[in-house]
Amino acid sequence: MADSRSATAAETVVIIGSGPAGWSAATYAARAQLQPLVFEGAISEKNRMAGTLPLGQLALTSEVENYAGFPAGDLGRFLDSALPSDRRMMMPPHEGHGVTGPELMELMRQQAVNFGTRIVTDDIERVDFSRRPFRLFPAAGGEITARAVIVATGASANWLGLPSEEKFKNRGVSACAVCDGALPRFRNQPLVVVGGGDSAVEEATYLTKFASTVHLVHRRDTLRASKIMAQRAIDDPKITIHFNQALAEVLGDDARGVTGVRLESTTERGRTTEVEAAGVFLAIGHTPNTAFLDGQLELTAKKYIVWKKHFRTDTSVEGVFAAGDVADDYYRQAISAAGTGCMSALDAERWLAHSHG
């Protein structure tokens, strides 16, 4: 939905980015009569590869089983006993399988629109927070001004760039063990985790709850994880560590998805090993989508936006707020992103109410 107001009128709130954080921020801002304008991202090959298409990274996830309110399993038994007369009315279309990522994101998007959110399917390429109202420059050209801004551009998982990795994304290849590890396809199956830092060890340890065994693949001869985390992996009987190995290829077929991996030695040229696996989890870090800010906000050493107040979404510039994975390098869950989206809208509303902007 394009903005029909004068280009000279400053928007009250502009939200940059979509996903759970952006749509939650939009819903709360719209309900507060702030008339939010959302730049949900452009539909482009660049954004597809980065996982920053409209609707956010969750739109690339086939199944979501851990978002509150969308249970997997048989809801019929509960509804028959609790609300037998209303069973048909209450039964959701996603009954029995949780909800897909695109389905959840489209529902959140539509909810925001229902309350009056306006949407532009484009990227913001650069910003100027040095003057008020703030200046935002869309990729399609022109200039938008805003009294308050919420940045919800997320963080993109790092990938190896293998063609086979791309082929089997959401068919056994994932970048989030907590999101996908409990899916039925991975239960009691051998799984592979690629990486050697704390995140990789945490994901490998988490997956031992579901997998028959976990193969932790690291290209060096020692783990980069902290000593206590590394020792935990070494001592775990369900984790096998493959040192000095790099993922060369994800193996599989159209019918079954991932069936294994081919590893290549980093110390012995030409030496390869095949490992059977039903899933491959990349744990080689994330890159927050903050490059377009170009020094306008304070960032951490890892380029995440800094929240300047405890349990608030304020950034280093008053009137600019951050929500979701663009500022969170710890939890990185859809539901926590949605929570900070809500917080950012409330923070923006209160800031604006005190005659700022």
Regions found by a protein language model. Give the residues of each.
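A Rossmann-like FAD-binding core segment of flavoenzymes
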Residues: D80, S85-R87, E103-S130, L136-P138, ...
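FAD-site-proximal beta/loop scaffold in flavoenzymes
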Residues: A2-S4, T8-A10, R31, G161, ...
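Short amphipathic alpha-helical segments
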Residues: A26-T27, G161-S164, A204-Y206, I228-M229, ...
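Residue-level detector of alpha-helix initiation sites
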Residues: G19-P20, A155-A157, G197-S199, D328
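Beta1-alpha1 glycine-rich phosphate/pyrophosphate-binding loop at the start
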Residues: D3-R5, V13-I16, P20-F115, V201-K227
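Glycine/small-residue-rich loop that forms an oxyanion/phosphate-binding "nest" at active or ligand-binding sites
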Residues: I119-D122, V127-A139, A146-V149, T153-C179
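Conserved N-terminal Rossmann-fold NAD(P)-binding element of oxidoreductases
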Residues: I16-G17, V192-G195
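Active-site acidic short loop of glycosyltransferases
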Residues: A10-E11, T145-R147, N188, A277, ...
